[in-house]
Amino acid sequence: MTQPIVVAALYKFVTLSDYVELREPLLQAMVDNGIKGTLLIADEGINGTVSGSREGIDGLMAWLKSDPRLIDIDHKESYCDEQPFYRTKVKLKKEIVTLGVEGVDPNKSVGTYVEPKDWNALITDPEVLLIDTRNDYEVSIGTFEGAIDPKTTSFREFPEYIKAHFDPAVHKKVAMFCTGGIRCEKASSYMLGEGFEEVYHLKGGILKYLEEVPEQESQWRGECFVFDNRVTVRHDLTEGDYDQCHACRTPISAEDRASEHYSPGVSCPHCWDSLSEKTRRSAIDRQKQIELAKARNQPHPIGRNYRLPSEA
């Protein structure tokens, strides 16, 4: 029986002043363990999602934890039948999740972590302002009951949204969440700096909540967007029902795929009337190469246009 592929989402805010020198040995550790996916490293820490065999993931995590700075690195696991990534990469970044505000440092200041088992009690408190820190395309397919959608298209827009809509003197309790915990952790650091005093965030993010909280007790509604070829996962962390448009990167449903405006790998109902001719031609060429590679049982020559959590 074929063993399922293990998908591990991991991150840690920690000062890595030698992150440039760390790139090559980290990449070699991924290759040695047969790992696919992308890891981002910066002075402020490490972030990414990777996949491989059980032994491979265990080997990579052991390698990471051999560094005393990463011994308690956070990671969440899920499983799938097909490899969700095509390449193995380590990227050097200014930030491991891009907020774009100087001075925000979760290594120095961060909100209160809330365990998944305690999350429901917090977010059902009428005095708590619940904010989804993810982007609009993620929120559209699933979120927590009663959560506010900032309708951002990039995490860089989050600070301006907060400044325009909320006041530390009025909004006394704020709870935030994101896919794996990293974005809301950085958002909590930002909000503390803006004067919000009681700031909470979901430890381990949505993925940890879905893993630990029974569906019958859950406050989660819908599916959860993930940054790999699975596109979404259900409450039981199995692969969801959405695909992703290669052109605009929007999650697309079965109804979207049935639309006359859907062309696999080229366009969907969300973007068919806004694509430039250059983008359309490029998408058509890319799709042809992908289909040829698939027919030959070869790796995809051009990776899907998926956003990384740090760049979204």
Curated annotation (Swiss-Prot):
Which InterPro entries does the entry mention?
Rhodanese-like_dom, Rhodanese-like_dom_sf, TrhO, TRHO_N
Domain annotation Rhodanese: ranges: 124-218
Which reactions does this protein catalyse? uridine(34) in tRNA + AH2 + O2 = 5-hydroxyuridine(34) in tRNA + A + H2O
GO molecular-function term, one example from the UniProt record: oxidoreductase activity, acting on paired donors, with incorporation or reduction of molecular oxygen
PROSITE patterns, sorted = RHODANESE_3 (PS50206)
Keyword list (alphabetical) reads: Oxidoreductase, tRNA processing
Q: Which GO terms describe its biological process?
A: tRNA modification
Q: What is its EC number?
A: 1.14.-.-
Region Disordered, as annotated, extends over 293-312
Which SUPFAM superfamilies does the record associate with it?
Rhodanese/Cell cycle control phosphatase (SSF52821)
Q: Name one Pfam family in it.
A: UPF0176_N
Mind telling me which NCBIfam families this protein's record contains? PRK00142.1-4 (NF001136)
Provide the function of this protein: Catalyzes oxygen-dependent 5-hydroxyuridine (ho5U) modification at position 34 in tRNAs.
Q: Which family does it belong to?
A: Belongs to the TrhO family.
What is this protein called in UniProt?
Answer: tRNA uridine(34) hydroxylase
Q: Which organism is it from?
A: Pseudomonas savastanoi pv. phaseolicola (strain 1448A / Race 6) (Pseudomonas syringae pv. phaseolicola (strain 1448A / Race 6))
